[in-house]
C-alpha cells in the first residue's frame, strides 16, 4: 500500500477522533494506536481501519456505534469515495479512481527509486556478516549468511541508513596456526618426509596445493626432519566406529598433539613460519573474496583481527579498573555473570595468552568507537551461546548493549537425491558455495537462502531450484518480468509504441478486480520494504514478490494485453488501443516493481527466459 495514502487516511481518522475528544466522547489523553491495512477483497474497499475497535474501551462505547460517530466527523477529502462500517466496527475505505491510480504515477516518476525513502537518513549502521575463518573455501552454510547479510544491508540502505558492510577476518589465533602447520606438514611430505598428518589438521587437497606452490618457489629451503617437528608430541587421537555407526575416541588427544606440532614448527622455522601462514591466508582469503564477489556480495571493509592486537590490553585494563576481572586457577576471568551471562569467561589463560573472547571484546568496542548507531552481527546458529558474553562485555564497558543486534542464521541442509551431504572443513569433505552456485546459479541461491526467516532451517532442494515451473518461486518471479518485456518486444515488432500519455489518460479503464488488486499490491511495495528493512527480514520481500508475480500471471492469462487485431496485422479499433495502453501501463508498473525488488535481493531481472 502507498505510505502516503496510509498517512493521509490515518490523519483524517485522527482528525475525526479529535472532534470526538472535543465533544467529550473520547478522553483528552487518548492516544491513537490504530492501524490501516490493505483490504483483502475489493468488496471490502481499498483499506480498513480498526480505530473504532481500539478506541471503544476509552470511549465506553460499542465499536460499531463509535465507528458511526467517527465517519460522521471525518473531514471531507477528494481521495475517499465512500466509507463502510463492517463486522464488529471496522471502517472500510473506498478510494476515488484518481487516488487509486496515483501509485502508477509514483512508480513512473521514481522508476528504480520507487519504494526508497530517506526516513532513516543520518543513521549509521554496520552489518558484519559471513566472517568465516580464512582456513578453507566457503561452504553452503556460509552462503546463507552471505545472502542474508547482503540483503539486509541493501534493505537498510533502501530506507535511508548509511550502511557499512564488514567482514571480520580471523587472521590471528589458533585456527591460523593449525592451517599454517597443516600446510607445513604437507610441504614436508612433498619433500619426501614420512609424516603422520594430525587428526586435528586441515585435510583438504587445497592445503597440499598451497604447499606445492611454496615447494615450487623455495624447493627444500624450509625442510626440517619430521622427527624434530613431532618431538614430544603426545599420542594423536585414535578413533573407531562403534556398533551404532558413530565415531568413538579410543585413545589420544588431537588438540594436545597438534599444539605440540605447532610449537615445534614455530621453533624450527623461526621467522620463516610466516611464509606458510601468509601463503595459506593469502590464497584462501583471496578465494573467499573472489567467491563472494562472483555471488554479488560486497563489503566496504575487510577488518583484520591482527589490526586490533594493540587494543586488547587496553580494553582488559579498562575492565580490570572497573572491577570486572579476577584471577582464578592462574587464569584471568571476566565477571560475565554480573551482567546476565550463565558463567564467567576466561580472557587470559594461565600461559599469558589472551583468548578469542578478549579479541572480540576489543573488536566490538572498536565498532562502537567508529560511530555506528547500531551494530548488526549476522552469526551462525552455533554462536547462540556467545551472545550473552558479548552483551555483558559491552555493558561492562558502558556501551548500551541494545545497540547491538545479533541475528542467528540457521543451518542449511543440502540434499542430492536421497543423500544428505555432511560438511566438515577439517576433513575437506564439504560442498562449497561455488559448487552450489555453479549447479543452481546465483539467482536461485540468493533467493532461496533468504526465502525463509533466518531462524528457520533450510532444506535446499537442488532440483526445485533448477526447475522452470511455477513451483520454483524465483523462476516464476523472473518470468513475470520477462513476460512484460516479451509483450513490449511483440508490440514494437508490429510497429506500435507504448504511449505513456495515452496509458495514463486511459488507466481508468482498469476496473477489473484483478487490476484493482494489482494496483493495491503495487502501492504496498514501499511499506513492504520498510517492514523488511526494520525487521531485518528479507523473506518479507521474497513473499511480496511471489504474491505480485502470481497475481500478475493470473491477470495476464485472463486478459489480452495486445489485441487480436494487432497480432493478426489488422487495424485495431480506438477502444482496443485505449485498453491496450492502459494495460501496458499497468504491466510496465509491475515490471518496474519486480525489478526493484529483485535488485535489492541481489537477483537479476531477465528480459527473456
From Swiss-Prot:
GO terms for molecular function: arginine-tRNA ligase activity; ATP binding. It is an enzyme of class 6 (ligase). Its main location: cytoplasm. One of its GO terms (cellular component) is cytoplasm. Gene3D superfamilies: Arginyl tRNA synthetase N-terminal domain, HUPs, Isoleucyl-tRNA Synthetase, Domain 1. A motif ('HIGH' region) lies at residues 132-142. This is Arginine--tRNA ligase. It comes from Psychrobacter sp. (strain PRwf-1).
